[in-house]
A protein has these predicted regions:
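Activation segment signature within eukaryotic-like protein kinase domains
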Residues: 15-16
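Pre-DFG segment of protein kinase catalytic domains
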Residues: 50-53
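Canonical protein kinase catalytic loop motif
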Residues: 32, 37-38, 42
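Activation-loop N-terminal segment of eukaryotic-like protein kinases
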Residues: 43-47
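AlphaC helix of the protein kinase catalytic domain
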Residues: 1-7
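Protein kinase catalytic-loop region centered on the HRD/HxD motif
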Residues: 19-31
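C-terminal lobe helix-coil module of Hanks-type protein kinase domains
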Residues: 75-167
Length: 214
Protein backbone atom coordinates (compact mmCIF):
# COMPACT_ATOMS: atom_id res chain seq x y z
CA UNK A 1 0.00 0.00 0.00
CA UNK A 2 2.87 2.37 0.73
CA UNK A 3 4.21 1.58 -2.74
CA UNK A 4 1.01 1.41 -4.80
CA UNK A 5 -1.54 3.31 -2.71
CA UNK A 6 -4.96 2.28 -1.35
CA UNK A 7 -6.78 -0.75 -2.72
CA UNK A 8 -10.18 -0.52 -4.44
CA UNK A 9 -13.13 -1.24 -2.17
CA UNK A 10 -14.46 -4.35 -3.88
CA UNK A 11 -10.96 -5.79 -4.13
CA UNK A 12 -10.42 -5.27 -0.40
CA UNK A 13 -13.62 -7.19 0.33
CA UNK A 14 -12.50 -10.02 -1.96
CA UNK A 15 -9.04 -10.23 -0.41
CA UNK A 16 -10.11 -10.01 3.23
CA UNK A 17 -13.00 -12.50 3.03
CA UNK A 18 -10.86 -15.66 3.49
CA UNK A 19 -9.20 -14.00 6.50
CA UNK A 20 -12.62 -13.41 8.07
CA UNK A 21 -13.52 -17.06 7.46
CA UNK A 22 -10.24 -18.26 8.95
CA UNK A 23 -10.64 -16.08 12.05
CA UNK A 24 -14.22 -17.27 12.45
CA UNK A 25 -12.98 -20.88 12.51
CA UNK A 26 -10.18 -20.00 14.94
CA UNK A 27 -12.59 -18.21 17.27
CA UNK A 28 -14.81 -21.29 17.40
CA UNK A 29 -11.90 -23.15 18.99
CA UNK A 30 -11.75 -20.48 21.70
CA UNK A 31 -8.58 -18.80 20.38
CA UNK A 32 -8.30 -15.03 19.86
CA UNK A 33 -5.45 -13.69 17.68
CA UNK A 34 -5.05 -10.28 19.44
CA UNK A 35 -2.40 -8.92 17.06
CA UNK A 36 -4.06 -8.33 13.68
CA UNK A 37 -2.50 -5.51 11.68
CA UNK A 38 -1.13 -4.89 8.17
CA UNK A 39 2.27 -6.10 9.41
CA UNK A 40 0.81 -9.52 10.18
CA UNK A 41 -1.14 -10.04 6.96
CA UNK A 42 1.04 -11.06 4.04
CA UNK A 43 0.24 -11.13 0.33
CA UNK A 44 1.49 -14.01 -1.81
CA UNK A 45 2.12 -13.98 -5.57
CA UNK A 46 -1.55 -14.83 -6.24
CA UNK A 47 -2.60 -11.76 -4.21
CA UNK A 48 -4.02 -14.03 -1.51
CA UNK A 49 -3.77 -12.87 2.10
CA UNK A 50 -2.01 -14.99 4.73
CA UNK A 51 -2.54 -14.17 8.42
CA UNK A 52 0.59 -14.79 10.50
CA UNK A 53 2.08 -14.18 13.97
CA UNK A 54 -0.02 -16.02 16.51
CA UNK A 55 2.50 -15.21 19.23
CA UNK A 56 -0.07 -13.15 21.14
CA UNK A 57 -2.98 -15.55 20.58
CA UNK A 58 -4.78 -16.59 23.75
CA UNK A 59 -7.74 -18.70 24.79
CA UNK A 60 -10.83 -16.50 25.06
CA UNK A 61 -11.52 -17.65 28.63
CA UNK A 62 -8.14 -16.44 29.89
CA UNK A 63 -7.86 -13.16 31.75
CA UNK A 64 -5.01 -10.73 31.21
CA UNK A 65 -2.13 -11.11 33.65
CA UNK A 66 1.26 -9.48 33.86
CA UNK A 67 2.90 -12.66 32.61
CA UNK A 68 0.93 -12.70 29.37
CA UNK A 69 2.37 -11.24 26.20
CA UNK A 70 0.68 -7.96 25.32
CA UNK A 71 1.47 -6.24 22.02
CA UNK A 72 0.16 -2.85 21.03
CA UNK A 73 0.01 -1.81 17.39
CA UNK A 74 -0.79 1.87 17.12
CA UNK A 75 -4.04 2.30 15.21
CA UNK A 76 -4.99 -1.38 15.31
CA UNK A 77 -5.22 -2.38 19.00
CA UNK A 78 -8.68 -2.04 20.62
CA UNK A 79 -8.88 -0.13 23.88
CA UNK A 80 -9.71 -3.20 26.00
CA UNK A 81 -6.31 -4.73 25.24
CA UNK A 82 -4.62 -1.79 26.92
CA UNK A 83 -6.31 -2.58 30.23
CA UNK A 84 -4.92 -5.16 32.65
CA UNK A 85 -8.28 -6.90 32.98
CA UNK A 86 -9.86 -5.84 29.76
CA UNK A 87 -12.83 -7.85 28.49
CA UNK A 88 -11.34 -9.02 25.19
CA UNK A 89 -12.76 -11.59 22.82
CA UNK A 90 -13.76 -12.08 19.18
CA UNK A 91 -14.90 -8.44 19.10
CA UNK A 92 -11.28 -7.42 19.76
CA UNK A 93 -10.13 -9.16 16.57
CA UNK A 94 -13.10 -7.56 14.78
CA UNK A 95 -11.73 -4.13 15.73
CA UNK A 96 -8.20 -4.89 14.55
CA UNK A 97 -9.36 -6.45 11.27
CA UNK A 98 -11.70 -3.55 10.45
CA UNK A 99 -8.91 -1.10 11.29
CA UNK A 100 -6.71 -3.03 8.86
CA UNK A 101 -9.41 -2.81 6.19
CA UNK A 102 -9.64 0.94 6.84
CA UNK A 103 -5.92 1.23 6.15
CA UNK A 104 -6.18 -0.90 3.00
CA UNK A 105 -8.98 1.33 1.69
CA UNK A 106 -7.52 4.71 2.61
CA UNK A 107 -3.78 4.32 3.14
CA UNK A 108 -4.35 6.06 6.49
CA UNK A 109 -3.45 4.46 9.83
CA UNK A 110 -6.57 4.81 12.01
CA UNK A 111 -6.51 7.06 15.05
CA UNK A 112 -5.37 5.29 18.21
CA UNK A 113 -8.26 3.71 20.14
CA UNK A 114 -7.18 5.21 23.48
CA UNK A 115 -7.09 8.69 21.94
CA UNK A 116 -10.51 8.09 20.38
CA UNK A 117 -11.93 7.46 23.85
CA UNK A 118 -11.16 11.10 24.68
CA UNK A 119 -11.89 12.70 21.31
CA UNK A 120 -13.09 10.60 18.40
CA UNK A 121 -12.51 12.56 15.21
CA UNK A 122 -11.65 9.63 12.95
CA UNK A 123 -12.54 10.37 9.34
CA UNK A 124 -15.52 8.28 8.25
CA UNK A 125 -15.35 6.15 5.12
CA UNK A 126 -18.60 7.68 3.91
CA UNK A 127 -16.78 11.03 3.71
CA UNK A 128 -14.20 9.63 1.28
CA UNK A 129 -15.79 9.39 -2.20
CA UNK A 130 -12.94 7.34 -3.67
CA UNK A 131 -13.74 4.32 -1.44
CA UNK A 132 -16.63 3.20 -3.70
CA UNK A 133 -18.33 0.84 -1.29
CA UNK A 134 -22.01 0.88 -0.44
CA UNK A 135 -23.12 2.87 2.59
CA UNK A 136 -23.96 -0.42 4.31
CA UNK A 137 -20.45 -1.78 3.76
CA UNK A 138 -18.77 1.44 4.85
CA UNK A 139 -20.90 1.61 7.98
CA UNK A 140 -20.13 -2.04 8.77
CA UNK A 141 -16.38 -1.37 8.74
CA UNK A 142 -16.78 1.72 10.93
CA UNK A 143 -19.03 -0.19 13.34
CA UNK A 144 -16.35 -2.86 13.58
CA UNK A 145 -13.98 -0.06 14.65
CA UNK A 146 -16.29 1.30 17.37
CA UNK A 147 -14.23 2.28 20.41
CA UNK A 148 -16.60 0.60 22.87
CA UNK A 149 -16.59 -3.17 22.46
CA UNK A 150 -20.34 -3.55 23.00
CA UNK A 151 -21.01 -1.36 19.96
CA UNK A 152 -19.01 -3.57 17.61
CA UNK A 153 -19.97 -6.78 15.88
CA UNK A 154 -19.47 -9.48 18.49
CA UNK A 155 -18.30 -12.16 16.05
CA UNK A 156 -16.67 -12.56 12.66
CA UNK A 157 -19.87 -14.17 11.40
CA UNK A 158 -21.91 -11.04 12.12
CA UNK A 159 -19.24 -8.86 10.48
CA UNK A 160 -19.23 -11.13 7.45
CA UNK A 161 -23.01 -10.97 7.15
CA UNK A 162 -22.99 -7.17 7.24
CA UNK A 163 -20.25 -6.93 4.61
CA UNK A 164 -21.18 -9.66 2.16
CA UNK A 165 -24.85 -10.68 2.32
CA UNK A 166 -25.95 -7.86 0.03
CA UNK A 167 -23.41 -9.09 -2.55
CA UNK A 168 -24.52 -12.72 -2.26
CA UNK A 169 -20.96 -13.77 -1.39
CA UNK A 170 -21.52 -15.39 2.02
CA UNK A 171 -22.98 -18.72 0.94
CA UNK A 172 -20.51 -19.20 -1.89
CA UNK A 173 -17.50 -18.79 0.40
CA UNK A 174 -19.06 -20.89 3.16
CA UNK A 175 -19.41 -23.81 0.75
CA UNK A 176 -15.85 -23.37 -0.47
CA UNK A 177 -14.45 -23.50 3.06
CA UNK A 178 -16.76 -26.15 4.47
CA UNK A 179 -14.59 -29.22 3.89
CA UNK A 180 -11.51 -27.44 5.23
CA UNK A 181 -13.09 -25.82 8.27
CA UNK A 182 -14.06 -29.20 9.76
CA UNK A 183 -10.45 -30.20 10.18
CA UNK A 184 -9.62 -26.76 11.59
CA UNK A 185 -12.35 -27.02 14.19
CA UNK A 186 -11.34 -30.53 15.18
CA UNK A 187 -7.75 -29.43 15.59
CA UNK A 188 -8.62 -27.15 18.49
CA UNK A 189 -5.62 -25.26 19.81
CA UNK A 190 -3.44 -26.86 17.15
CA UNK A 191 -4.90 -24.43 14.61
CA UNK A 192 -2.32 -21.88 15.73
CA UNK A 193 0.54 -24.24 14.95
CA UNK A 194 -1.09 -25.19 11.66
CA UNK A 195 -1.22 -21.53 10.63
CA UNK A 196 2.46 -21.05 11.38
CA UNK A 197 3.39 -24.22 9.51
CA UNK A 198 1.37 -23.10 6.49
CA UNK A 199 3.37 -19.88 6.26
CA UNK A 200 6.64 -21.78 6.71
CA UNK A 201 5.63 -24.10 3.89
CA UNK A 202 5.02 -21.16 1.57
CA UNK A 203 8.42 -19.72 2.38
CA UNK A 204 10.10 -23.08 1.90
CA UNK A 205 8.48 -23.51 -1.49
CA UNK A 206 9.78 -20.12 -2.53
CA UNK A 207 6.43 -18.35 -2.35
CA UNK A 208 7.02 -14.61 -2.29
CA UNK A 209 5.22 -12.93 0.60
CA UNK A 210 5.03 -9.25 1.48
CA UNK A 211 3.08 -7.36 4.14
CA UNK A 212 0.01 -5.54 2.81
CA UNK A 213 1.25 -2.35 4.43
CA UNK A 214 4.51 -2.33 2.47
Amino acid sequence: IKEHGPIAGERVLQMIHPVIKALSAIHKTGIIHRDISPDNILVNQKEELVLIDFGSARAERQTMTQSMTVLFKRGYTPEEQYRGRGNWGAWSDVYSLCATMYFMLTGIVPNESIERMIHDDIKLLRDMPHIRLSATEEDAIMRGMAVKANRRFQSMESLEAALYESRGWVQRVVLYFQHKSKSVLLAGGAVVLAGVLAVCALLTMGGKLSAIGS
